[in-house]
Amino acid sequence: VNASDRTPADLLRSALTTDPARPLVTFYDDATGERVELSVATFANWASKTANLLQGDLAAAPGDRLALLLPAHWQTAVWLLACSSVGVCVEIGGDPADADVVVSGPAPDDLAAARACRGERLALALRPLGGRFPQAPDGFADYAVEVPGQGDRFAPFAPVDPDAPALAVAGTELTAAQVVERARADAKALGLTAPGARLLSARPYDSWEGLSAGLFAPLAAGSSVVLCRNMDQLSAQGLAKRIESERVTGTAQGDTVS
């Protein structure tokens, strides 16, 4: 990790330079049995394609605001880094009526709320392997249809300002530099200090604590996250087995860290 990195996108670029093959995000959904592992290189490729979609097809520019109506998921993590790459401010669970772009998951309530956005509207099916909707929701482009053809490399049209708003979550707005600063501090508190550290996080993405444990702190520390959704459906025995098989070195569940 480079000390001069001042945005999450900078952190990802540094990781890609130093250790592209290491796992960055390993995602489990215990409601569906899905497991997806993304190396730094694979994750960065998804982020680049998504940033090209955001900057090109969706015409997003630095300073624009994107309402993100998605749960803790590997594709949500990709969107967070894509927005950082373009300089778009992500509002977690933000009001679509006030946003320039809205990105929604498949939940009917989220799609209904997202229709209030007067700008571009994109929907994610959140199906295994990044699958598409059988039919895209009315008024939305399907992310899984739009993203594969995007370029594998991304260059922003304008430089990203580390001191511009980058993330709004649970009533707090942070600049890109503040996200990086907080993530670095959290990495130490979460025990992400040794090489090869792997944090299992079952926290939702609706708070800074969830976003940090589930993405930003492991990224800042040069470690990796095992991101678990619907883990209440996993038995204690199943969790113990996962911790062993994934070589987990620490866990973040609710307010507890171990």
Mark where each language-model region is.
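Flexible, charged surface loops at secondary-structure boundaries
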Residues: T17-D19, A59-A61, G94-D100, A114-R118, ...
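Short beta-strand->loop structural element characteristic of the AMP-binding/adenylate-forming
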Residues: L68-L69, T76, L80-L111, E120-L129, ...
